[in-house]
């Protein structure tokens, strides 16, 4: 292997952790900085915040100076997100949602996001969680589509016009191969 392809394992990390660090943290750095333009003092919503890229987004969001709201599916996962640095947590119900449940989740997201909404939403989950999250985005916010294990999201694009926001796909592997 060329030396340029090697990375030093961070102190305190096992080889098993090291094997996943490049993918999870590389994806997340690309998402938050290159695609989401996250800046100090902004508000970040992380869906699936206890998964690999979700926890990376919580940790990196805090390191970049953002207020981080972590959305997860259980109290145990909320505790993991808090341990990673989340300022606030939301425990959401499991999908699928009916219309009332979707509205209720959007209200939870909005309440936690505050008056201005979220500057950046990091979504590695998709499915029924995407629309309620998009409804909580702030003016000119950035919605990052990182994955969709809960299903391909269906978003009403009129929301992007009403919020003057961006929806960005994040595919770090293709980005890294092209650059």
Task: Give residue spans per PLM region.
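Glycine-rich helix-loop-beta junction characteristic of Rossmann-like nucleotide cofactor-binding loops
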Residues: 34-38, 112-115, 135
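Glycine-rich phosphate-binding loop and adjacent beta-alpha segment
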Residues: 72, 81, 128-179
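NAD(P)H dinucleotide-binding glycine-rich loop of Rossmann-like/cofactor-binding domains
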Residues: 1-48, 96-97
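Glycine-rich NAD(P) Rossmann-fold beta1-alpha1 loop
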Residues: 25-26, 48-58, 127
């Amino acid at each position: 292997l060329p030396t340029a392809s090697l990375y030093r394992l961070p102190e305190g990390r096992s080889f098993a952790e090291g094997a996943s660090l490049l993918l999870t943290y590389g994806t997340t750095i690309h998402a938050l900085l290159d695609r989401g333009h996250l800046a100090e003092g902004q508000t970040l919503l992380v869906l699936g915040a206890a998964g690999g890229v979700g926890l990376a987004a919580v940790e990196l969001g805090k390191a970049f100076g953002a207020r981080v709201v972590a959305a997860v599916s259980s109290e145990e996962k909320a505790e993991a997100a808090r341990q990673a640095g989340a300022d606030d947590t939301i425990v959401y119900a499991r999908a699928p949602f009916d219309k009332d449940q979707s509205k209720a989740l959007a209200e939870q997201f909005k309440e936690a996001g505050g008056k201005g909404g979220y500057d950046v939403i990091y979504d590695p989950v998709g499915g029924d969680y995407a629309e309620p999250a998009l409804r909580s985005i702030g003016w000119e916010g950035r919605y990052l589509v990182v994955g969709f294990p809960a299903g391909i999201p269906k978003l009403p694009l009129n929301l992007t016009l009403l919020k003057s926001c961006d929806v960005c796909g994040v595919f770090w592997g293709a980005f890294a191969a092209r650059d």
